[in-house]
């Protein structure tokens, strides 16, 4: 059996994920493995896809191996998926699976991205392995990697695969331009940045959405089109920026980001759905923001989305947008699409975003935000010697304050309550008054509110 490994890491042979693949290769000597370093050599495959096409055609199993970069695959692998789908070659019926290494920060959205695109190509997708970066160094991690691939072979032998979720696509509605008189008589101070990757040649649905939003928003807007920025390449995972936030690429993106985008009072992302995501350029933009490390430098600023395409059929993309705003500490003012009622949704987004900016409106984090930041908190605390700027930022903003071992008073109180609850006589005497005791601090809040 022939396995083609698509190594999506820009570090090539030095990829931690690839070491897991090599370990599996040693454990299954009767299986032939071949690796394409698509992350490191993406420019080569952009120029000539023929070699990759031949390797893909000859493979029985296509194995995507990559580190998770900002919720998804590295931008270089995202681009290779585009090339696969654009090549026109027939891969239907072949098996595909994936191996990732990360600290489990939104590995689920990365895996779903690959699964969805495999479904588009008619590949029979098998559930992948999501490993911690340190797993291969442990006996359990090595055992899990070997068991994973043995299970993959069993599934292939029996012809099993994950079901494809796709059905039909609903038609989209053209956006009606807002008349000039619909614009506010006077703009409020502050600028909202609209980041897009649209092709500005000719009229398109996304352009109409952006224009209506700009008319209805009571703030000045600045459009930043990623197509016009001369990206030298994607994030290389080299950690050159860990010390002072300066990227190893000399294209000036780090300065451009901080001066032209992060200075806005709010940020709106406008895109057309491509390959179940925001498109390759937006992934390039996301990955290159690692010049900010794990620092949520725009927290407190609201965000919004203008989406051209069938968002209702993209649950993974919906989760990604909400999770990104939650982790970043940005209030998600809304997502307007051109599926059902585009004018109403765009107008509502404009008004809601304006309210959030004017009133500095923020909400507490949900599971996406709390869970994601706890992973980052633990990671940065362990790696503070390398990621010094991140560590300094986390200390200054109280990200370490919720370490459970710091709340010794609460821990001691729970021990006391637990000991009291063991006393049967006391428990019987208290009856249902336990909940009354729990609510005492909350009752005091209401009493204090009455006094004010």
Language-model features: locations:
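Short, glycine-/small-residue-rich phosphate/pyrophosphate-handling segment
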Residues: 92-133, 299-343
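Generic structural signal for helix capping and beta-alpha/helix-loop junctions
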Residues: 13, 43-45, 106, 135, ...
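N-terminal beta1-alpha1-beta2 submodule of the flavodoxin-like/Rossmannoid cofactor-binding fold
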Residues: 1-87, 146-153, 164-291, 347-355, ...
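Short, conserved loop/helix-junction motifs that constitute active-site signature segments
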Residues: 87-92, 292-300
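A charged, well-structured terminal subsegment
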Residues: 120-167, 327-361
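Alpha-helix capping at helix-to-loop junctions
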Residues: 86-89, 105, 116-124, 154, ...
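A short secondary-structure junction signal
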Residues: 109-110, 140, 205-206, 280, ...
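Short, conserved, surface-exposed binding loops centered on an aromatic residue
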Residues: 258-261, 295-298, 324
């Amino acid at each position: 059996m022939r396995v083609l490994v698509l190594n999506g890491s820009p570090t090539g042979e030095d990829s931690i994920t690839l070491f897991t693949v090599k370990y599996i290769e040693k454990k299954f000597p009767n299986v032939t493995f071949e690796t394409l370093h698509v992350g490191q050599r993406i420019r080569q495959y952009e120029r000539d896809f023929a070699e990759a096409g031949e390797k893909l055609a000859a493979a029985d199993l296509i194995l995507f191996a990559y580190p998770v970069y900002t919720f998804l695959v590295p931008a270089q692998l995202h681009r290779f998926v585009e090339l696969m789908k654009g090549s026109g070659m027939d891969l239907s019926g072949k098996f595909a699976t994936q191996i990732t290494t990360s600290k489990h920060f939104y590995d689920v959205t990365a895996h779903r991205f690959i699964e969805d695109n495999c479904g588009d190509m008619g590949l029979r997708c098998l559930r992948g392995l999501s490993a911690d970066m340190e797993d291969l160094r442990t006996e359990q991690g090595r055992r899990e990697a070997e068991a994973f691939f043995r299970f993959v072979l069993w599934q292939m032998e029996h012809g099993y695969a994950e079901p494809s979720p796709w059905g039909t696509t609903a038609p989209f509605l053209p956006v009606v331009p807002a008349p000039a008189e619909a614009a506010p008589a006077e703009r409020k101070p502050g600028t909202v940045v609209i980041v897009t990757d649209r092709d500005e040649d000719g009229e398109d649905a996304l352009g109409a959405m952006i224009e209506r939003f700009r008319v209805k928003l009571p703030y000045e807007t600045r459009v930043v089109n990623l197509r016009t920025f001369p990206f030298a390449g994607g994030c290389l995972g080299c950690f050159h920026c860990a010390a002072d936030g300066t990227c190893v690429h000399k294209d000036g993106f780090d300065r451009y980001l901080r001066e032209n985008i992060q200075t806005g009072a709010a940020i709106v992302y406008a895109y057309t759905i491509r390959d179940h995501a925001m498109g390759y350029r937006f992934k390039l933009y996301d990955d290159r923001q690692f010049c900010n490390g794990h620092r949520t430098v725009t927290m407190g600023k609201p965000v919004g989305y203008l989406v051209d395409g069938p968002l209702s059929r993209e649950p993974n993309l919906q989760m990604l947008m909400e999770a990104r705003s939650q982790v970043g500490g940005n209030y998600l003012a809304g997502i307007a699409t051109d599926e059902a009622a585009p004018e109403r949704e765009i107008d509502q987004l404009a008004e809601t975003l304006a309210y959030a900016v004017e009133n500095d409106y923020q909400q507490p984090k949900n599971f996406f935000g709390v869970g994601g930041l706890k992973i980052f908190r633990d990671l940065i605390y362990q790696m503070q010697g390398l990621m010094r700027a991140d560590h300094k930022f986390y200390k200054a903003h109280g990200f370490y304050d919720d370490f459970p071992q710091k709340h010794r008073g609460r821990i001691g109180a729970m021990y006391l309550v637990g000991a009291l609850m063991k006393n049967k006589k006391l428990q019987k005497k208290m009856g249902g008054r336990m909940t009354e005791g729990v609510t005492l601090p909350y009752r005091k809040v209401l009493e204090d509110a009455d006094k004010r």
